[in-house]
Each structure stands twice: as structure tokens, then as C-alpha cells.
Amino acid sequence: RSDVGYRAKLYGYDNVFCPEAVVYHVGSGTSGSKYNSFKVKLAARNNVYLNYKNMRTWQLLLNSPCLLAGTFVKFLFFKKMGFGKDYVSGFLEGIRTLKNCKRVPSFKGRIQREIGIQLELIAGTAVYVYEFSRRQAAKLGAKV
């Protein structure tokens, strides 16, 4: 899902939220429950692929602190659920097999779209941090 959405943005499409939309997806149809070893490994690997395939090197470097922080937070989440080793295994598999991934090619107008996407990522991160901080402050206020 994320890969298609990111690539669509690169090619000039808008991603919009449509609450009335109905999507049929057999995501867990063959892989089992919400979280299992197979799905955790696959998700970790695919997160590596998503960024590598769609971002140029300058974006990977610019976003690396946030990407690494997000990877660490996901690792902690899956470790708490008993899937820490599976997450690391999938992440490392993604790194090892990057050479098999086909990156989105260059095309006219891509740099402008990349800059636009980058600004959206920065703004979205700022909003997320702000809202997360407010939720945490509200929790602390309720506990005091």
C-alpha cells in the first residue's frame, strides 16, 4: 500500500482519504494472524525496500535519523510482543537483498515532486510529534 502511494506521488498523483471507499484486501488470508513471525519479517524487509526503491540517495541521507528512529521504535514494539528477533531478521534481509530491488527511474519533473514530498514528510512529522506530545501531556495531567 505505502509503496504504491509513494510512487503515485512521485508520478504526480494525489493520495486522498475517502471514508466511503470499500477496499477488499486479503492481507492476512495466507499469512495468518495480525502478528506472526512471517508477517513481522516481511513487514520489516518491505519497509527497507519502500524507502530504497522510492527515495534518492539525498533523501535517504536527509531522512536517515527519522528512518533509524522509526526502525528502533518498531523494533521495541515487536520485541515487547516477542517478535524482536524476527523484526531484526527481516530488516537485515532487506539490507542484504537491496541489490535485487528496482528503483523508481529518473524522469522529467521528478526533483520538484521529490522536494514537495520531502516538505510533506517534514510537515507531517512535525504535526505527529506535536499531537503525540499533546496526548502524552494529557495522559500525565490525568494521572497527577
Ranges and model annotations:
Residues 50-51, 94:
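Short alpha-helical functional segments enriched in proximate histidine and acidic residues
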Residues 22-24, 67:
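Positions that flank functional sites
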Residues 54:
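Extracellular glycan-interaction patches encoded by glycine-rich segments
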Residues 24-45, 76-86:
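Nucleotide-sugar-dependent glycosyltransferase catalytic core
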Residues 1-22:
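A short, conserved alpha-helix in the catalytic core of glycosyltransferases
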Residues 60-144:
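Non-catalytic, C-terminal membrane-associated alpha-helical segments of glycosyltransferases
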